[in-house]
Amino acid sequence: MKITHVSIRNFRCIRELDLELGDTTVFIGPNSAGKSAIVDAIRIVLSRRWGQRGTGFTELDVYRPDEGGDPKTLPPVMIEISIEEPSAGAWDADMVAALDDIMTLSGAKNIIRLRVTCAWSAEKDAFDPLWQFLTPDGDPMTGRAQRATNLTGFFHYLPVFWLGALRDAADEFHSRGSWGRLLKDVRIPKELEEEVLKTLAELDAKVIAADEKLTKIAEQIGHSTHVAIGDSPGSARLNMLPVAIEDMLARSGVLIQNEALRPWLPLGHQGQGLQSLAVIFLFQAAVSQQLLEAESGMEALFAIEEPEVHLHPQAARALWQRVSTLTGQRIMTTHSPYFVQHVPLRDLRIVGLRGGKSVVASIPARTVSTVPWTESVSKFIAGAQLEGIFEKDPASGNIAAKSWFSAEYAEKLAGCFKGDADATTKKAEIEKLRHKCRTMPSAEDEVELGFHGRRVRGEIFFARRWLLVEGVCEHLLVHAIAKALAWPLDEHGVTVIDFQQSGNAGIYPALADAFGIPWNMIVDGDAESEKFRQQIMDRGYNEDDLKLQFTMHPKPQDLEDNLVALGHEPLLRKILAQIQGKTALTCPTAEFMARLKNKKTGYMSTLAPMVAADQVLAAKMPKAFVDLISGYKAKKP
């Protein structure tokens, strides 16, 4: 049983938010954007403790549009979760029978909807939470569904395990923490217990007998019974070792040896990164132990905040493999680009704050059209082996797409309706579907990003804007221009992506639009620019989409041609002479240009610092770069 949809209203910084959740969902974004609020909303809904003193709901959880808002009079908090069976009959039969009172049907599939609200009650003089199971129409269920045992049973089958970012190994590896709860399930055979306790008693006696001061201390303490009781004084003895197995387990701890020749040290004496990792592994062990005893049908939800805390990049990358194998549904937040590098694109949710309200962007799993799925369509899809792109939407019976598709496929789909009276209308609808799907990566795209874009993929999703350029030279130059114009790109959240080194030119505009990230692309004015433009258009973009975002240097110039046309040949000859010798100062122009283009990174590594230090020189750099950065500065994106 997994949560498929979450609806949040008037909770903390969230005014209105609807989310689709998968088996794994990773929330990323800037601080205070609402990531933890989303996790807490889900956690509170699945909590067993209700009322202001137990749920986590307080007046501070009510969304306030301004600082003068009174939580008592503002709209109430409302959190709603939907849990839909993945396919008919997929859920455990015993669980379905146990939760029958609160289940409804969506087609042939079972579905559970739970709504939690929290509003001010003048009668109770407190914020009063209310939880209700809902009908498919969103109305509260009545009758047997209102029994309190239904909520208890529901929580039993969907337990939530939360691990916050501020985890403390000292707290968790304590008898009252996860460590203690894990040890409570330890069972030692009675014969072994008796043998251990006998051995401990003998060792205890030897330790005390080793120094007569210990015996005298015990005798002195024993006098306290005479003062307290009076008539029949007792005695006291020192206990140096545990007297019961429970005591021994309670005193247990963890020692770690980092390398074979290093000493064994307590966990508390290790670094913060190792302690944080240890807590995660303890969390996994404790939950796994608990789930071993779970009934059939129970499926846990893991809510983990910033699993990468204190870890170095390689460890953060490796950690994804660990947490992604947790059995159940996984919801995580992270600020680590290294952790994000391995997260599948469709598992990412980018959280932002706009106008004081949280917004979330993601890649849709599929897009449904208004065009019906016919026998002709089915034959075309099967014959062309396009099941990975198209499918029939079971709810509407229409064509649904799972990734972008080419104009050729759109034309052939339209051909399936060429004899229909409304063939023109259906062709237009297919074109609309293609345009909507332009932001959805294919399986090949994900592989390409994983291979080419690993070095930038994690970082780019934390940026406020993407600037796409062809290569390393452009990357260095735009950073230098921005610095000279007193508007450093990194400080303003602009990531520069040299897309030729990191995948197909069409992938990044599509991803940017899917995640709501503004983008611009600047390319050379040569023949290659048309190839890049076409790669974007092939995904379903149109001319209007690219009008303000795709810019070229003057045709037919590439970057070096443009720099020379702007009058920088003398400066570039001097730079090239430092690299290749004085012949660069006097060689023919054609030879000079060939040599310059053959030493792109070499000349730019010298030119870029000069540009960064000279605002006048920066203003004379290629117009496309200067105008764009000046525009950024004026708009302050």
Regions found by a protein language model. Give the residues of each.
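Extended helical coiled-coil dimerization/tether regions that scaffold
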Residues: 169, 174, 182-304, 395
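Conserved nucleotide-binding/hydrolysis micro-motifs of P-loop NTPases
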Residues: 44, 83-89, 120-124, 167-170, ...
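Acidic, divalent-metal-binding catalytic cores of TOPRIM
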Residues: 354-637
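Electropositive, glycine-dotted interaction segments
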Residues: 86-195
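Short glycine-/polar-rich loops that comprise or flank the Walker A/P-loop
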Residues: 75-79, 110-114, 156-160, 299, ...
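Conserved P-loop NTP-binding catalytic core
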Residues: 40-108
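Switch/communication elements of ASCE P-loop NTPase nucleotide-binding domains
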Residues: 1-47, 257-435, 439-443, 447-456, ...
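Short alpha-helical segments and helix-capping/turn motifs at coil-helix boundaries
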Residues: 61-67, 99-102, 138-150, 238-240, ...
